[in-house]
């Protein structure tokens, strides 16, 4: 049986990347939350 996770970098960037997070209001909220938590890595 094929595994469910077949990694693709472009798909990852489109879904969870910085620019996709910046493009929506909810995404910007996520970024601000992660900044306030002090995360070194904000996005994928």
Curated annotation (Swiss-Prot):
Domain of life of the native organism: Bacteria
Xref: Pfam families: Ribosomal_L34
Annotated GO MF terms: structural constituent of ribosome
UniProt KW Isomerase keyword: no
Disulfide topology: none
Stated name of the protein: Large ribosomal subunit protein bL34
Keywords: Ribonucleoprotein, Ribosomal protein
Native source organism of the sequence: Wolbachia pipientis subsp. Culex pipiens (strain wPip)
């Amino acid at each position: 049986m094929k595994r469910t996770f077949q990694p693709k970098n472009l798909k990852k960037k489109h879904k969870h990347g910085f620019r996709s997070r910046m493009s929506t209001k909810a995404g910007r909220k996520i970024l601000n939350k992660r900044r306030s938590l002090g995360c070194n890595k904000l996005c994928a």
